[in-house]
Amino acid sequence: MRVLILGSGVIGVTSAWYLAQAGCEVTVVDRQPAAALETSYANAGQLSFGYTSPWAAPGVPGKAVKWLFEQHAPLSIRPTRDLRQLAWLSQMLRNCTAERYAVNKARMVRMSDYSRDCLNALRAETGIEFEGRQLGTTQLFRTQQQLDAAAQDIEVLAQYGVPYELLSPAQIAQFEPGLAGGGAQMAGALRLPEDQTGDCRLFTQRLAELAAQAGVTFRYGQQIERLEHAGGQVSGVQIDGRMETADRYVLALGSYSADLLLSLGLHLPVYPLKGYSLTIPIVDAQRAPTSTVLDESYKIALTRFDDRIRVGGMAEVAGFDLSLNPRRRATLEMVVNDLFPGGGDLAQAEFWTGLRPATPDGTPVVGATPYANLFLNTGHGTLGWTMACGSGRYLADLMQGRTPEIDTEGLDVFRYLSPRSARAQREAA
């Protein structure tokens, strides 16, 4: 089976790896000169198998109004003229109920938990190195209100058997001794011992090398322009002005996936959620994090690589703008100075931004479509690195006609389509 994968971020490359391992003839196409040069380039670096939550949560609508007036707000909305932004925000607000939050979080935890097992198996099989650590995540709560609000998340963790531990303020430094050098006061913390860390770009590029050795063809620097369809199937992809065909197609273009689907009449509610990061050289390892620390107040993660600290987070709903906002840099610097002062050289930090492909309910879109030979692997939001291996393996099983190892409920695009709508799109094709 010939498979054409569109996109060479961590999602596209893991898809290519698992499909090649299943015996498919795989080609990956991307506009960039190498793998992982867009959203996968400098994300926060945490593999948050336990810390998996949708942005659409109870209380967020009220908080969003308050955040409009805060300098260091974790979420900001900058209106554009794109009507899709308004539609996406409307759908997100409808998912901010306790009932929807529980459903969405359970789906996300299901995929994240599976992805951890897939990544661990991949590491054991290939020996791939990506400055990874398996030392867990410490989620910091600055207020008792934040700690109390974590009860619902803890219920889901218990439901899925995800190990966790609640820490008192005095216990936090046992896992992150560098925090003792900061002046921040904490009400407590949630410890997720099975979470991991690692450089997503390094992982993706090294897995691309392994995939190439396994027979995958990577074609970089090529513009993916349009999908064509006929008879209920995709009939080809226009790449650099030339139509190319395959037996099956995988769309893994992150935030740009939705635009490409418009020519098929398929409206995918994936919208860019802009995030920022700083990559900071370590100057004092004793004052740096040992793994991943999550600051619940600012929704910022601080992650340890070998000799660097990656500080990442925030979410701007601002369309496809990739400009660097200096106020966001100030927020990242404020948090790292508050928690780990003196650990890194901020003057030498690399400031970066990327567009995470977010769905309004937080769950990715992985699986089949109304077009028989088109599959999607996108919409992972802030958790693409976390869910990449599980999504890739899950998709490969679906495309090979094998029964996936996890429940498929609610993971594909059909959750957004009524049966009548899906049938009409098939017939129109």
From Swiss-Prot:
<comment type="similarity">
    <text>Belongs to the DadA oxidoreductase family.</text>
</comment>
<dbReference type="InterPro" id="IPR023080">
    <property type="entry name" value="DadA"/>
</dbReference>
<dbReference type="InterPro" id="IPR006076">
    <property type="entry name" value="FAD-dep_OxRdtase"/>
</dbReference>
<keyword id="KW-0560">Oxidoreductase</keyword>
<comment type="pathway">
    <text>Amino-acid degradation; D-alanine degradation; NH(3) and pyruvate from D-alanine: step 1/1.</text>
</comment>
<comment type="function">
    <text>Oxidative deamination of D-amino acids.</text>
</comment>
<dbReference type="GO" id="GO:0005886">
    <property type="term" value="C:plasma membrane"/>
</dbReference>
<keyword id="KW-0285">Flavoprotein</keyword>
<dbReference type="Pfam" id="PF01266">
    <property type="entry name" value="DAO"/>
</dbReference>
<dbReference type="InterPro" id="IPR036188">
    <property type="entry name" value="FAD/NAD-bd_sf"/>
</dbReference>
<protein>
    <recommendedName>
        <fullName>D-amino acid dehydrogenase</fullName>
        <ecNumber>1.4.99.-</ecNumber>
    </recommendedName>
</protein>
<dbReference type="GO" id="GO:0055130">
    <property type="term" value="P:D-alanine catabolic process"/>
</dbReference>
<feature type="binding site">
    <location>
        <begin position="3"/>
        <end position="17"/>
    </location>
    <ligand>
        <name>FAD</name>
    </ligand>
</feature>
<dbReference type="GO" id="GO:0005737">
    <property type="term" value="C:cytoplasm"/>
</dbReference>
<dbReference type="GO" id="GO:0008718">
    <property type="term" value="F:D-amino-acid dehydrogenase activity"/>
</dbReference>
<keyword id="KW-0274">FAD</keyword>
